[in-house]
Amino acid sequence: MFRAIAIIRAHEVIDAVPASHIVLERDERHLRRKAITLENGEKILADFAEPVVLEHGDRLVLDDGREIEIRAASEELYEIRGRDPRHIAELAWHIGNRHLAAQIETDRIFILRDHVIRVMLEGLGATVTDVVAIFSPLRGAYSGGHQHHHGHDHDHHHPDHE
């Protein structure tokens, strides 16, 4: 089984045609070590030292030099619109307060479908529409850099933060 050993981000891709591609949903694009079946039926192993988030158009570089293109799957989402920019900000706050993954744009927000959240958002005056689209939510504050693993107390000191 060939191994994916590097990532080329979509904005760095040169016009070479990929050897194959794989379609992954948002949750499947967060990985560290995982066997993946390509569109052509071949299995590869994504094997990275740290967890990575793959975006639409990124490429995995295999240990034999081939490039595999990542395609984000279309998912069942809600498109959420508010009355004005302030209302959108308030809706984003309520979504974030519930720790939901959200793709936030200038005039709308996308989240995965959840009927309880839909009722809440409509109760707050949002217009909520069912859509099927690629979902690229914002990454959280802990997605890079200094991370706390929540299996321990935070009652410790960081010399570089004092």
Swiss-Prot record:
Molecular function via GO: nickel cation binding; unfolded protein binding
Basic and acidic residues bias: where? Answer: 152-162
List the residue ranges of the region (Disordered). Answer: 143-162
**What keywords are assigned to this protein?**
Chaperone, Cytoplasm, Nickel, Nickel insertion, Virulence
What follows loss of this gene?
Disrupting the ure1 operon causes loss of urease activity, decreased resistance to low pH killing in vitro and decreased pathogen survival when inoculated in BALB/c mice by gavage.
Cellular location(s): Cytoplasm
Q: Which GO terms describe its cellular component?
A: cytoplasm
Q: Does the keyword Chaperone apply?
A: yes
The biological processes this protein is annotated with in GO are:
protein folding; protein-containing complex assembly; urea metabolic process
Pfam families cross-referenced by the UniProt entry: UreE_C, UreE_N
Q: What is its main location?
A: cytoplasm
- What Gene3D superfamilies does its record include? Urease metallochaperone UreE, N-terminal domain (2.60.260.20), UreE, C-terminal domain (3.30.70.790)
For the keyword Plastid, the answer is: no
* NCBIfam families listed in its UniProt record: PRK13261.2-6 (NF009760)
- Please give the function described in this protein's UniProt entry: Involved in urease metallocenter assembly. Binds nickel. Probably functions as a nickel donor during metallocenter assembly.
Question: To which protein family does this belong?
Answer: Belongs to the UreE family.
Q: What is this protein called?
A: Urease accessory protein UreE 1
